[in-house]
């Protein structure tokens, strides 16, 4: 079992990987995956805090956040599909040029 320090280290590393990936990528799908990595790193932190304080509330919060994230991903993928069908690209810079 992981100790609290290792768990928070993994959570912080995942958070920064998500931030860096969010800043580097210009494809909407990769940006969505980066946001999911960020959300999951925050969820991991909540679970570790709940385990440390021996509270079940964080597990309930985990289920709620995962449900919201799943709905978010499905809606965003549907929007991305429509964008791709219309403009034939998911590159944010090309979409910005098209919209001008």
UniProtKB/Swiss-Prot annotation:
Catalytic activity annotation: a quinone + NADH + 5 H(+)(in) = a quinol + NAD(+) + 4 H(+)(out)
EC annotation from Swiss-Prot or TrEMBL: 7.1.1.-
Q: Which UniProt keywords apply?
A: Cell membrane, Membrane, NAD, Quinone, Translocase, Transmembrane, Transmembrane helix, Transport, Ubiquinone
Q: List the subcellular locations.
A: Cell membrane
Q: Which Gene3D superfamilies match?
A: 1.10.287.3510
Entry GO terms, CC: NADH dehydrogenase complex; plasma membrane
> GO BP, one example?
ATP synthesis coupled electron transport
Q: Where are the transmembrane segments?
A: 4-24, 29-49, 60-80
Membrane topology (UniProt): Multi-pass membrane protein
Family from the record: Belongs to the complex I subunit 4L family.
Oligomeric form and interacting partners: NDH-1 is composed of 13 different subunits. Subunits NuoA, H, J, K, L, M, N constitute the membrane sector of the complex.
What the protein does? NDH-1 shuttles electrons from NADH, via FMN and iron-sulfur (Fe-S) centers, to quinones in the respiratory chain. The immediate electron acceptor for the enzyme in this species is believed to be ubiquinone. Couples the redox reaction to proton translocation (for every two electrons transferred, four hydrogen ions are translocated across the cytoplasmic membrane), and thus conserves the redox energy in a proton gradient.
Protein name (database record): NADH-quinone oxidoreductase subunit K
In which organism is this protein found? Buchnera aphidicola subsp. Cinara cedri (strain Cc)
The lineage is: Bacteria, Pseudomonadati, Pseudomonadota, Gammaproteobacteria, Enterobacterales
Q: Which gene encodes it?
A: nuoK
């Amino acid at each position: 079992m992981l100790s609290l320090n290792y768990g928070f280290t993994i959570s912080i590393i995942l958070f920064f990987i998500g931030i860096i990936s969010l800043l580097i990528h210009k494809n909407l799908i990769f940006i969505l995956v980066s946001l999911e990595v960020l959300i999951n790193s925050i969820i991991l932190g909540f679970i570790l805090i709940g385990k440390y304080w021996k509270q079940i509330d964080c597990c309930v919060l985990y289920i709620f956040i995962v449900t919201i994230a799943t709905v978010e991903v499905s809606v965003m993928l549907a929007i991305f599909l429509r964008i791709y069908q219309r403009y034939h690209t998911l590159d944010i810079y090309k979409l910005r040029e098209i919209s001008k």
